Amino acid sequence: MTTTTGPGSRPTSIYLLAAHPHWRDSRANLALREAARQVGGVDVNDLYASYPDYAIDVEAEQARLARADLLVLLHPIQWYSMPALQKLWLDEVLSYGWAYGGGGSALEGKDCWLVATTGGPEKSYHPQSYNRYFFDAFLPPYEQTAALCGMRFLPPLLFHGARSATDEELVAHVEVFSDRLASYPNWPELEDMEGCPSCVVPATDRPHEHEEA
């Protein structure tokens, strides 16, 4: 498993999952990943390097996540969602009885932050453009995943039009990202955010292992 931490000796409080299936073709996500590695207290996990065979070490991942106050999901938006390995990580690591449901309180009180890029410009996420919806329409799966696990879903940091962005635009965005990581949890807007809604899953809805709906 690949484990990378930023310089410094303070305890890890941020767990960042960097998920990109083709890093060699990445510019924006690669810059963001490398910037995160320079911030103290950030545990960076390059999912596609850690699990090229998609065999996720659930116990190890749960231990890393349990130590963190903030979970960061860093990835490109692909087909209006997350890369396949990031989705598999959620499916396997956020298990019933640990992350949610009866006895599943390991993540209560933590924060979840989406840091994502899109290939198309922001104006393409509009009812009159080819993506047909404002980008917020694609956020509910992220928001509800966090809520079901008792986490606050923080305002996402998005970089639209990553393919056509200038070097200056990318540098400015990476600086904002680095500053936010380094200053967490001292973000002014967090003081006004409401706590996570209660999402109680009754025992009758408990998923059974190896059983499909």
PLM features per residue range, with description:
Residues G6-N45, F177-S178, C199:
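N-terminal beta1-alpha1 ligand-phosphate binding loop
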